[in-house]
Regions:
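Histidine/acidic-residue-rich, glycine-tolerant segments that coordinate divalent metal ions
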Residues: 97-108, 112-227, 244
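Hard-cation-handling environments
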Residues: 241, 250-261
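Histidine-centered divalent metal-coordination motifs
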Residues: 62-66, 180, 239
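Short catalytic-loop micro-motif centered on adjacent basic/acidic residues
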Residues: 93, 123-126, 234-239
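Metal-associated gating/positioning segment near the N- to mid-region
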Residues: 52-117
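N-terminal metal-binding scaffold of metallo-dependent hydrolase/deaminase domains
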Residues: 1-41
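Active-site metal-binding motif and surrounding structural segment of the metallo-beta-lactamase
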Residues: 38-54
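Single conserved hydrophobic/aromatic residue that forms the stacking wall/gate
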Residues: 259-270
Length: 270
């Protein structure tokens, strides 16, 4: 059993920043020490981290590595190398690749591929569709991190828009549901409205806030929250983008605070 002492570091952890050291026993942190306190037991190796920050391994629970099928952009080998270099030691990958991770076979193949390519810890979301709800109860919940649910259309065309399918997903998933929430009916209506007024060709990006509007976001998010309350499902709503939606979570934990705050005003300036 090898013990390594990393000392003279600036430790960043749980909202605190302090000078100190860490003792690692094989691959497990066994002591976190403040100031010049020395380890309780002598160590086999020492690393002077003067001038460096020392943080726990970061867990990124929402990545798109585009593997399989879109590996001209990136793959699990390249992205986990970048992750490790930046201190990210675990990731959870989304299912809108090619083929989509919407069957048990595709999910198993992705785990097998990751075992050969990944140099950090990994898990994968299973993609829900209108037609695969019968597979949810067959998922290995010790290894699958959650079910990705597109309640609005996005990359990969995995929209789930049948209320009976949504109810079944919320009642039978048995693991975390990570939902992309935009009401597709409102989006279609807004798209046609913009096209009728400004023309069919290449709708300008400036119309994005009108098409994927506050109402579209709120309507879908409120439905997701309602279904979660009715079924007791564990729900995460991803990339919330409106103040109105935040009202749905006033008494709920927020695990990722706002990290970017552009508005339609900023789009006009860009």
């Amino acid at each position: 059993m090898k013990r390594t002492w990393i000392y003279n570091a600036t430790i960043v952890n749980e909202g605190l920043k302090f000078a100190g050291s860490v003792v690692v026993e094989d691959d497990t942190i066994c002591e976190v020490l403040q100031g010049e306190v020395r380890p309780s037991v002598p160590c086999d190796a020492e690393i002077d981290a003067r001038g460096c920050y020392l943080i726990p391994g970061v867990i990124d629970d929402h990545v798109h590595f585009r593997d399989p099928g879109l590996t001209h952009k990136a793959d699990m080998a390249s992205e986990t190398a970048a992750a490790a270099a930046g201190g990210v030691t675990s990731f959870m990958d989304m299912p809108n690749c090619n083929p989509q991770t919407t069957t048990l076979e595709a999910l198993e193949n992705k785990f097998a591929d990751a075992a050969n390519k990944c140099i950090v810890n990994y898990s994968f979301y299973f993609g829900a569709t209108n037609n695969n709800t019968e597979l949810l109860q067959q998922l290995d919940k010790k290894h699958v991190c959650g079910v990705k649910l597109f309640m609005g259309a996005s990359t990969g065309n995995m929209l789930v828009d049948r209320i009976e399918s949504l109810r079944k997903i919320f009642s039978e998933a048995g693991i975390l549901i990570a939902a992309h929430c935009e009401d597709q009916t409102i989006i279609r209506w807004n798209t046609e409205l913009v096209k009728s007024k400004y023309g069919e060709e290449d709708v300008d990006i400036l119309f994005h806030p009108r098409i994927r509007s506050e109402e579209a976001c709120w309507r879908s998010s409120s439905l997701a929250v309602q279904l979660a309350k009715e079924t007791g499902a564990r729900l995460h709503i991803l990339h919330v983008s409106t103040a109105r939606e935040l009202e749905l979570f006033e008494d709920k934990p927020i695990s990722c605070l706002l990290y970017t705050s552009p508005s339609p005003r900023d789009m006009r300036r860009s």
